[in-house]
């Protein structure tokens, strides 16, 4: 017997469906659901008098062999692969299936079997994204990890050894001993982690030994001397071992200008950190490197988006992070050369047109580790407010823009650092790192952060209350953040050379260990929704930025979305 209900009633019960639109937080961004993989009339829902009961939505005979370990029901998935509604089945810590969950004895189209061994997360009315990948981490303090996790970041790539002066300025874990100790420290955290070694040496062996020790990539930083010889040696090692190189170029142009750096790179793939220049790099025209096919460009979140306070904040920030002395005129000039309103304004637009491919934090070293996702969506909203819908949009929503921006902190950094086989998207076979959001809090405060198929962080009320919701509701670590569960639900990434040398056994690592790879053949064309290669020029006198001969600029925002109304308490 059929039953008719209004869209409003349906959305309230099972969540929105195909053609429905959802507003993201308090922004002007809307998503339109492109497809619904659940089956009308056979939807699953947990609760008293609901569907997921023995012999109904739950298969009465299915053992663990047939059933999934966890199912997220009626989720709206926001991913580079699409914006759609589906159930998500998780088994052995991986995404086993996406589609229709339930009992195939009674229901049509079931590809996710719910049984007695299945846990349920009710995701109707919620948005699910892949866990974020922050590929610009200074590992200055371990408390960064819980801050990042509670914001929806589940993978951190960078370098450091704690609050050492070198780490405060550069993302390097230098040398075998330091790499080993940091790999051991990573065992304690419910976070996927990969470390970058120091790439600043003009000979290969001091660099190569760090890759063999476990570094998944190398960092070239001007504070260690990013000379042409160091760039070439580092990239030769990277080509040999199939790892990525991240570069922070020479702000002062002491060793050469941007053209000399490009000549030293010589067409080899490289990840350019804070390509906008405010975080460092050839002044004033580092951003022109984003024109080239071998450059995978990212920028960091303090300049995201450009607001009326951005310039004032950056000067003091820069002085501290790079160990500069405000009483030394040359140090002041160094700082001033980086902070340019014209290039920061252009950065907004270069992200919006897909010329800049990634956004990361630069944690505690001119960046906020818990605001990568927040500032990504603030940038997207500012661009829509100032320039309207993208011309590529076809439906009622902002789906193209949303896919472009979600890719900046999920799939693209995963591709760049050779880990997209494991993380970075909501796809079958990938590690089940998922973030559940209420639409009103999307991008600001997640409800649940799932690591490897188990809840690692959540908003949780008073533990002494009779129900989970009474105040104070705070972010608290959940069971995947404790004990041996950490090792089963989080990944340590290593170079293939270290993996094959048996470094995990040598150090007694218990976390899941995965090798990185498929890096050295990458080009900007591999940056999903963010592969625009345009001619970018910066006027050396006025700092004005032109793209294909056209001036690009925008006004600073006076007010941003996703801000004070969410952070009163």
Swiss-Prot record:
Q: How is the cofactor bound?
A: Binds 2 nickel ions per subunit.
Which PROSITE patterns does UniProt cross-reference here? Answer: UREASE_1, UREASE_2, UREASE_3
Q: What biological-process GO terms show up in the record?
A: urea catabolic process
Give its localization.
Answer: Cytoplasm
Q: Which CDD domains match?
A: Urease_alpha (cd00375)
Q: Which GO terms describe its cellular component?
A: cytoplasm
Origin superkingdom: Bacteria
- Please state every residue range assigned to the domain named Urease: 131-569
Family of the protein in this entry: Belongs to the metallo-dependent hydrolases superfamily. Urease alpha subunit family.
Name this protein carries in UniProt: Urease subunit alpha
